[in-house]
Amino acid sequence: MTVLPSVDFFPSGNTSVAIEPRLPQADFPEHHHDFHEIVIVEHGTGIHVFNGQPYTITGGTVCFVRDHDRYLYEHTDNLCLTNVLYRSPDRFQFLAGLNQLLPQELDGQYPSHWRVNHSVLQQVRQLVAQMEQQEGENDLPSTASREILFMQLLLLLRKSSLQENLENSASRLNLLLAWLEDHFADEVNWDAVADQFSLSLRTLHRQLKQQTGLTPQRYLNRLRLMKARHLLRHSEASVTDIAYRCGFSDSNHFSTLFRREFNWSPRDIRQGRDGFLQ
């Protein structure tokens, strides 16, 4: 597995925060690194396989990566990221207690992926731009300023994620996307889902297409197919069983959609013919 060392990304041994844009981020094999990072998805789509679990990421996704997490990117489509790197929560010169603001693992579950809406993403970009402007400056005032900006970023992300509620349609769409991630195998009635999240069906279609580039049903099908591909690679379940577990009522229809999406059949994936990135 590829290991990315901090010496390749931080300008000096005293630098506590660094910005690493990926515009765009191509498919990249599984790796980890000896530092922490906050991955901010600007726009585009892709699959983030994080500690073995696949997540569909789109504009507004935020992922908190620890120094022992392993992950890869695949099936990327114009995926643009900004990575905010930091050595460790306890390696700041002027900040203490940051762990209390970061996601915490509970009973083996780590809430690594958050979502923020477009207006928050704009504020995030402004803070990141200010941090970028000060890169290369290692005097104490510049270091303190960068760390203060990092704290502001962390507070903004935490507050915005915790307050992601039904106040506006963008927030409601983010809640809907998070709901789909957990209920992708359910029978989805889009009229009922729109009502559940207080969106008109037209608004749901328009905003989801703007955010993901896909219609709602196309997005759901892709989500199901991604989950199915993961199971084909990492479980012994039959193709038919996987199709049903991922929300498809007809295994033949599943196989047709699968080949159309990936240019490989489910059997090809099971046998490793696609040359899966390791």
From Swiss-Prot:
Compartments where found: Cytoplasm
Q: Which residues bind DNA?
A: 191-212, 239-262
Q: Which GO terms describe its molecular function?
A: DNA-binding transcription factor activity; sequence-specific DNA binding
Domain of life of the native organism:
Bacteria
- Main subcellular localization, coarse class? cytoplasm
Q: Where is this site: Interaction with sigma-70?
A: 241, 250
Q: A single GO BP annotation from the record?
A: positive regulation of DNA-templated transcription
Recorded hits in NCBIfam families, A to Z, give: PRK13503.1
Q: How does it assemble?
A: Binds DNA as a dimer.
Q: What is this protein called?
A: HTH-type transcriptional activator RhaS
| Source species of the chain | Shigella dysenteriae serotype 1 (strain Sd197)
From the broadest rank down, the organism's phylogenetic lineage runs: Bacteria, Pseudomonadati, Pseudomonadota, Gammaproteobacteria, Enterobacterales
